[in-house]
Amino acid sequence: MKKVYATGRRKASIAKVWLTPGAGTMTINGLSLDAWLGGLEAKKLRVKQPLALTKQDTSVNIVATVLGGGFGGQADALRHGISRALVRFNPELKAILKPEGMMTRDSRVVERKKPGKRKARRSRQFSKR
C-alpha cells in the first residue's frame, strides 16, 4: 500500500497531506470536509478541484492537517498539498495539474505596513489649506 506525503502552502497557512489508495474519504484536522468548511461551498469546490480534474475523487483517501491563516488560505494550501501529493502518487497527473496552475505555490502575501502611513499604501488625509 503506497502512502504519499506532501506539503501545500498559501499566505500564512500550511497543509500537511497524506494520500493513500482508498474509497475517496477526506479527513481534515480530524473532521470531514463538510464539517471542516461548513457552508463555504466555493472553498469546498476549490479543495476538490485537483481530485475532480484528475478523476481521482473516488480512488484515494486523504488525511490532512492544516495550520495557520483563515479558511481561504487554508483551503488553497490544502488544494496545493493535494495536487503535490497526487503528482507524487502518480507522476503522469502532472501534465493535467500543471497547466491549471495547481502545482504553483501562490506567493502573494500581505504587504507590510510602512511607517508614516495608515496601512501598507494608504496615506493620511492631505489638507491643502
Curated annotation (Swiss-Prot):
Transmembrane segments: none annotated. Residues 104-129 are annotated as: Disordered. InterPro entries: Ribosomal_Su5_D2-typ_SF (IPR020568), Ribosomal_uS9 (IPR000754), Ribosomal_uS9_bac/plastid (IPR023035), Ribosomal_uS9_CS (IPR020574), Ribsml_uS5_D2-typ_fold_subgr (IPR014721). GO terms for molecular function: RNA binding; structural constituent of ribosome. Residues 114-129 have a biased composition (Basic residues). One of its GO terms (biological process) is translation. Keywords: Ribonucleoprotein, Ribosomal protein. Residues 104-113 have a biased composition (Basic and acidic residues). It comes from the Bacteria. GO terms for cellular component: cytosolic small ribosomal subunit. Coiled coil: none annotated. Gene3D superfamilies: 3.30.230.10. SUPFAM superfamilies: Ribosomal protein S5 domain 2-like (SSF54211). Belongs to the universal ribosomal protein uS9 family. This is Small ribosomal subunit protein uS9. It comes from Sulfurimonas denitrificans (strain ATCC 33889 / DSM 1251). The lineage of its organism: Bacteria, Pseudomonadati, Campylobacterota, Epsilonproteobacteria, Campylobacterales. The gene is rpsI.
